[in-house]
A protein has these predicted regions:
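Generic detection of short hydrophobic beta-strand segments and adjacent strand-loop junctions
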Residues: 17-19
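Short aromatic-glycine-(Arg/Gly/Cys) micro-motifs in beta-strand/loop hairpins
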Residues: 1-15
Length: 45
């Protein structure tokens, strides 16, 4: 497990959250499951 900085557009605001995940794709899925209405999700590192 690695820690990723994931950014998402949530209700018009850009938020950044640290997520523990196995891969970049998994980090995006975790972020989308955490915030159901998240859009434009991407990973910094």
């Amino acid at each position: 497990m690695r820690e990723f900085n994931v950014s998402a557009l949530l209700e018009g605001y850009r938020i950044t959250d640290e997520v523990m995940a196995v891969s970049v794709q998994h980090a995006i899925k975790v972020m989308k499951s955490k915030y159901r209405n998240a859009r434009n999700v991407y990973v910094f590192n």
